Amino acid sequence: GLIERYQTIVKTNIKTAIGTDASHGEIADNAILMNKVMNDTVENAIKGITINGAELCGLEHLVGSITEGKYADIVACKGNVENNIELLKNVDFVMKDGKIYKDNH
């Protein structure tokens, strides 16, 4: 099924992106699913919701990483997601196009 196919993709190092047509906030759940159920690494799951999606859409010059000249769209979570990917659901800071919308620091 789907899990076995995705695990094959992970083993062959094919670049994947994670997206959703659902309302905001659910993209973290998709990354967590990829990490926990599909046995992907935390790094690949995070790249799947950031730079990989941008590259696969041809938008890496505008979004996908924190780089000078790109849109300042940043989401930060308290804690180390490498140790606990569930922390992606605990958003502490949000910046969109350089404007801060949430700051719990």
Residue ranges and their predicted role:
Residues 1-80:
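His/Asp/Glu-enriched, well-ordered alpha-helical/loop segment
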Residues 83:
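Small/polar (Gly/Ser/Thr/Ala-rich) solvent-exposed segments
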Residues 87-89:
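Short, small/polar residue-rich loop motifs at catalytic or cofactor-binding pockets
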Residues 94:
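Short aromatic-centered micro-motifs
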